[in-house]
Amino acid sequence: MKKKMLIVGITMSVGGSEKSFLSFAEHIDYNEWDVTLLLAEKKGALLALVPSQIKIETMPDGEIMEIDVANAKKVLLKNYALKNPLRIFPLLCHSAKIFFSSGKRRAYAKHRLWLSAMKTMKPCEGEYDLAVAYWGDRTMFYAVDKVKAKRRIAWLHFDYNFPPREDALYEKYFMQCEKIVTVSKEIEKSLGESLPS
């Protein structure tokens, strides 16, 4: 019987993580693994290049994974205020911290705001032998909090120190992953400088 692998992504837009994923997908043993790619949204110029052996599914409330400055207000109001008005209070607390902070504290508050929003997402259905958070920190948070898996691996495609990240928060999530894969020596160095263990 094949083992089940879930790869957590965001979209298949033309970007470094997506291109790297396609290369990674070429090396999966599909005789050993039943693979599902879980995306926030089933879109992107590279979507057609996903191997046919990979089943593609979308996350409920996936727009939360795609929050950015341009759409944050709309997405957060839709997922907080309209669904459950009481959820607005943590949002307001994090928003105030963002507004009144600068530098590292502001970056930390932005991560906490997003994490608070992600916590409202429905869990991923099914159980997996392996969950791979391939698109970075947001997918790692989702894989740890929302996916039932025996093992987890996180891929880092970004400089850990930019924007500043809250070490205590990230360490908590890294500890729940069996392995952290860095895609370059520079990324490995930036992670090691902040979290040497």
Predicted ranges, named:
Residues 140-142, 178-197:
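A short, active-site helix/loop in glycosyltransferases that binds the activated sugar's phosphate group
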Residues 93, 97, 133-138:
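Short His-centered aromatic/hydrophobic patch
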Residues 17-28, 42-49:
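Short amphipathic alpha-helix
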Residues 107, 119-136, 153:
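Short N-terminal targeting/anchoring amphipathic segment
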Residues 2-14, 23, 39-42:
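Nucleotide-activated donor-dependent transferases that construct or modify glycoconjugates
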Residues 33-104:
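N-terminal strand-loop element at the rim of the active site
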Residues 110-119, 140, 157-176:
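Nucleotide-sugar donor phosphate/pyrophosphate-binding loop at the beta->alpha transition
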Residues 130-135, 141-160:
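Active-site proximal beta-strand in glycosyltransferases
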